[in-house]
Amino acid sequence: MAIQAQKGTKDMLPNDAYKWHYIEEKLRKISAEYGIREIRTPMFEATELFKRGVGETTDVVQKEMYTFEDKGGRSITLKPEGTAPAVRAFIENSLYADAQPTKMFYFTPCFRYEKMQKGRLREFHQYGIEVFGSQEASIDAEILSLVMRALTEDFGIKGLSLNINSLGCPKCRAKFNEALKQYLKENYDNLCETCKTRFEKNPMRIIDCKEKRCKEIVKEAPSILDYICEECSDHFSKLKAYLDVMGIEYNIDPQIVRGLDYYSKTVFEVIKDGLTVCGGGRYDYLVEEVDGPKTPAMGFGLGLERLLLILDEEGIEIPEPVRCEVYIGSMGDRARLEAMKLAFNLRKSGIKAEIDHLGKSVKAQMKYANKIGAKYTFVIGDSEIEENKIKIKRMSDGEQFEVSLDINEIVNIVK
C-alpha cells in the first residue's frame, strides 16, 4: 500500500497555493496598517510552556497535544496554538525592554489531536496577533476592529456575529467560581468524567466542555458578568464604548470562556453559521505565569482553513494569478536554444515565460500553452531564426503581431 498523508493533514497543491497567498497578503496588509510586525516562532516548544501557559486542565493539554521525548530526554510538544510561543519569545528576547506596546502577527501551523470537523484538521494553520504592554480597553477594541474589517471588508464575508464577554480578573473570577460550583453541585453526577475533575480545580472550564450533557447543564449557569469587580466592569464598558464609536456591532455572550486558561477580562469569538471563525482575548497574567515581568496582553487566532472554507461556501472568488504570460514554442534543437535564451531574458524583464521541455510537436506545445492559460504564444523554427522575425499571437482574440527576435520588441508587445 502506498504511503499516504496522515489522517487530519492535507497537502497544499499548486492549484490551491494562490488562495493561501491571497489571504496571507490581505492579512499582512491590514496588519501593517495597524503597525503590527511579523514574528516567527519554532514549530515545537518545551511541553512545560503549554502546561503552564495554556493550562493543565484544558482539553488542549489533557487530550490534544502531540508530545514526545527527544533524544536528549526532553519533553517536546508541537505547538497547539500560537500565543504561548509568542509570549516565550517576548520574554526570552527581552522585547519588554522596547517601547511599548509590542505588536506582532504570525502565520503558523498548529497541531492538535482532536476529532476532525468542518474546517478543522489535526494540522491546521493560524493567523494570529499578539499585543503586549497595554491594559487599556482601547487596544482590545483596535484588534477587534482589525478582525471585523479584515473579514467583512477585505474578504467580503457576510452574516458574521462578533460575540464578546469579560472573564474579569482573578479576584472577581474566584467569586464567580464559587457561585458556579454551587450551581453545578446538584448536577455533579451528570457531568462527564473530565468535568468532574475540573469541578474543584477549574470549574469555569466546564462551561467550555463540548460534551452534549455538560452543554445542557451549563445553559442556565450563573453569568460571570454578574460577578466582575468595578475595575473589570469599567474596562468592559470602555470596550463597548470604543466599539460603538467605530460602528462595530457586537453581541454580549456570557458563556464565552474560550478553551485556554490564560484569558482574563475581554474574550471574543466571531461566529459564522454556528462555527467559530476566530477567537481570542486578553491575557494579562500569562507573561508573568511563564516567568516574565508583569505585562498585560491581548491577542487572537484565525483559522486559515476555516476562512478558506467560508470564502468557498459564500461563493467569494479568489482571483487566480496569470501562470504564463508568454509560451515560446520551438521546432528543432537550434530553435530550442533560441527559445531558451528568449525565455531567460523575458523572465529577467519580469515576464512569466515557458518553453517546451518534453520534445513535443508544435501542435502539442500550443495545446499545452492553451491549457496553462498563456496570454501570448509564438513558435520559433529555422525560418524565424534566418529571417529574425516571429509572429506573436494574443490568445484572447487571436490577433498576431510581427516583430523581430529582439527582446525589447517582444517585451513591448507582451508587457
From Swiss-Prot:
Localization of this protein: Cytoplasm
UniProt EC number: 6.1.1.21
Cellular component aspect of the GO annotation: cytoplasm
Entry annotated with the keyword Transcription: no
Record GO terms (molecular function): ATP binding; catalytic activity, acting on a protein; histidine-tRNA ligase activity; transferase activity
InterPro entries reported for this sequence: aa-tRNA-synth_II, aa-tRNA-synth_II/BPL/LPL, Anticodon-bd, Anticodon-bd_dom_sf, His-tRNA-ligase, HisRS-like_core, HisRS/HisZ, HisRS_anticodon
Entry-linked Pfam families: HGTP_anticodon, tRNA-synt_His
GO BP terms, alphabetized: histidyl-tRNA aminoacylation
Keyword Iron-sulfur tagged: no
Keywords attached to this entry: Aminoacyl-tRNA synthetase, ATP-binding, Cytoplasm, Ligase, Nucleotide-binding, Protein biosynthesis
Main location class: cytoplasm
Reaction(s) the record says it catalyses: tRNA(His) + L-histidine + ATP = L-histidyl-tRNA(His) + AMP + diphosphate + H(+)
Source taxon at top rank: Bacteria
NCBIfam families: hisS
Membership in a protein family: Belongs to the class-II aminoacyl-tRNA synthetase family.
Assembly information from the UniProt record: Homodimer.
Protein name: Histidine--tRNA ligase
Protein's organism: Clostridium perfringens (strain 13 / Type A)
